[in-house]
């Protein structure tokens, strides 16, 4: 049976280039024609080869309805086989009808540059009510189908398809997205929460735009694979959260890009089930480029090599947060740090037992902030050789590391604001490292050992030049801590506030056989007070005295409590 139609022209059989049938008195062009054979079955006997499809099709075995907010800037038409042909659509609800044995609605557009655009909201995507609905064809047919037929790519405007199918759980197949040059936010949130889509469409674009794929497939819980991503030059936030919480994805994509952009991979694979991270060979980093990239990847066991030697702001921030199966951290060869570069990098990696070496002596603001917080299997801390610190450099660095037994020496003598704040909170070692600095900085030791219930021997505190909040809450809820001799005579605002709050340092205002040992602030000499310097220093501690002591006033420690000096 021939699959081409021949007609007689000038007495010769010529292959037909087009085929038309009469419908309602009008000639309609078709792509395929069927005829009944001798057994009563329909056989294809003519097919127009390479006929471009000029519509986007929604099809299901079951009836469905569609509606949408009218945000397009040209014209959209639909055809649902109701004998009206192509009808201009205003977004009001339309129903599918049986066409070629299945329920279908076709759409096409003219002179559109956006379908959703800047007025799009997550709360008003296209509404598709039904089940097991496929979307077939080229999405560009909604922009300008005539250009698609002509082999062109219609131009996309800002946020062109943003939020379009968000939360459409009945959609099982995504349309083709053949554009090669993208626009700002064009596919942002397009399929977020589409829980029935299993395969993503090809994404051939090589010229990306800011936020072009931002949250595109986030929370698509049935999505199992990631398409090739051929772009080598990235754009700001282009892949940010693209596959966030796609829990069925187990294999990471190849990332061929050689030129990164701000936030380009932020949260890209967060919450997926990948076991091995993709290679990340680029050595020229940009702000937040890998931030949160593998956040909550609980199955990740192998981290990529990170060869960059010069870091930038937040480049690895929270990169492996809560990767609970990660046991070995990658080497960190960087020689130049940047603000918040390693902030939270391995936080809550509960299987990590050994930290990477951190030999750099020139620090940056927040560089190691929260780096290992919550790593409750970590037993040995890295050497920290810096003698001059930076603001928040060690902030909460080992907070919650309750298996930590080998501590770093802390040789720094030049401190910075909040440099050690919360560094060892919620830990379990019994003896603290020494703190040799004599000139302090604002909040430098604030809450450093907060809720450290096993700490017995605190560090000697030789500083005589204090700063605002320098020791605030330092041993708060360290139940077994011993009191310290505090030599500074000139106090600072909030300097000892909450310092020994909720400990068992039991004081009395009067000396007795039960309370024999004198204790005062300062330990010797006459002190000069400051605003709230001693506020709640011993709050909720003993039965006879609790709360705020008075400077230069002698109190008495309960028998058996000795002073560390």
Language-model-detected regions and their locations in the chain:
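Enriched but not universal
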Residues: 1-60, 64, 556-565
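Short beta-strand segments and strand-loop junctions that repeat across beta-rich extracellular domains
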Residues: 5-8, 18-22, 32-36, 71-88, ...
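Periodically patterned hydrophobic/aromatic "hotspot" residues that form packing/interaction faces
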Residues: 5-7, 18-20, 33-34, 161, ...
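Small-residue-biased low-complexity repeat regions
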Residues: 8-11, 22-25, 36-37, 185, ...
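Non-cytosolic beta-sandwich-type ligand-binding/adhesion modules
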Residues: 53, 60-99, 541
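Surface-exposed loop/turn motifs at beta-strand-loop junctions within extracellular Ig-like
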Residues: 109-113
